[in-house]
Amino acid sequence: MKPFAVILLAFYALTMSAVPAKRERCTLVLADGRSVVATAMGDELVHYYLTDDGKYLQCSGDGVAHFVEPNALQKRWQTKVAKRQNFRAKKLASRQKKSQGSMTGSKRGLVILVQFPQTPFYYTNADFQRLFNEEGYTDDINFGSVHDYFLDASYGQFDFSFDVVGPITMSNPLSYYGKNNNNGDDSYPATMVAEAVQQIDPEVDFSQYDWDRDGVVEQIFVVHSGYDEAQNTRATSYIWSHAWTLTEALEEGDGEGPITVDGVVVDSYATSAELGGRTGTTTLSGIGTACHEFSHCFGLPDFYDTVGNSFGMDKWSLMDYGCYNGDGGIPVGFTSYERWFCGWLEPTELHNPLEVTDMPALTSEPIAYILRNSGKSDEYYLLENRQPESWDGEIAAHGLLVLHVDYDETAWTENTVNTVRNHQRMTIVPADNILYSFSLSGDTWPGTTGKTELSDYSTPTWGLFNENTDGQKLMNHSITEIAESEDGLISFIFDDEELGIRDVNANHNVNKAIYNLSGQRLCKPQKGINIINGKLYYEKD
């Protein structure tokens, strides 16, 4: 199915989605006074610290660190997700899928500025008007505005502007809404959102944010004063930026559920913080978190491992750690998948032998290629050209990036895309065959490795999770002669007729030396791939 076919359904299927913890090294103090250096990991659901030797820690409310077993973290995450999944199952059963098409044209979103009695805003409404709306906006860290980001991601098809209102002051201090409860969750963030909606209602016509006139506001966005717990993971009284619904929050004991104002229902929301970085800085937050959370409102799930430390998409996706590129001020551009999901790009299907030349950068033109598993069309590879320009200005490598997608509706709507280490459903095929964050510079083709071929027999290979029509987990295709020109254009050959896999019966005299892929000599071709006279052939029968 087309990936954006679940967009509007996903408006009503948001689990607690959040930005990942900023992976900063911290010195933690144990109960016995010892110090331990570890890296912040996880997200709003389950956050923890990971030492260099693979040990897990969490901090209690008083900031004291203690070791935990990874199985305990997994169980805690599964318990939280299961509770929310049960709720969503009931909700989804009562709704029908809607038509697509809301991610084009001109739309307006609502941004509410919220401050607290002891935590006033450092920046003004005018500053946020510029941050969200100004064309060509720049400041100390931001490459553009939120409006610029989505206009560029959509190739001009989605003109997303924002009405910024406030600031308004909450009735309680930040710690009331943000302090972590016994489960490690923020206590009352949805209560904060509901209070903000009710307080600003006399000034705002909420009905104008119901894009499809179904009686439900698509989303609202709350920017609160202070800092983000995702970037200050030991500050357990801060709010972790996230996207959620008031309905689901009610199930968790936070708030009273959806609010009806101006004849429409407010339910889906997202949040981010005013200030970026560590406590004590006064830098306006980068737009990366806002772009990430708004993208959840569009229906995109998280592509980082929401429970462990698998690679996912790392810095290659806004929905993973790419929201922090350039300290959050230059969030990485949408991948071809994300643009396709939103209806801004239609990848070219690869079926027959094809020579591709002058493939432009993804940031400049909506061009990508897709190769599907013949046995399961929802598993496929996407080929895109990533160059260090525009929103990709902070990427670690340039060249052809290969994405492997194994779409599953349940994993997407339940925000569990990359939680299984040996079955990541949205990731890349790194040219250097190293799927770790410390080796991003070797991810692209030909890149630093100089590799020019990707096939069933190359290293790395492009295997499958699901069987093809032949009952094997092979693509039975190849991409060869991958090259990058001096001006950043990509070329390659798909299924080279000279080098590709051929039909033995139709193309070859079998009275030659025949081998299998293990190097064993055969008397005659066997079903599958054979090496005959130094070339690859495919035996059908």
For every predicted segment, state its role:
Residues 88-136, 175-187, 226:
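Fold-level signature of zinc-dependent metallopeptidase catalytic domains
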Residues 17, 529-541:
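C-terminal tail/sorting-segment detector
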Residues 9-17:
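Hydrophobic h-region of N-terminal signal peptides that target proteins for export
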Residues 96-100, 144-262:
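Active-site-proximal segments of metallohydrolase catalytic domains
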Residues 149, 219-395, 406-408:
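Extracellular hydrolytic enzyme modules, especially secreted metalloproteases
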Residues 362-497:
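Extracellular low-complexity, Gly/Ser/Thr-rich intrinsically disordered linkers
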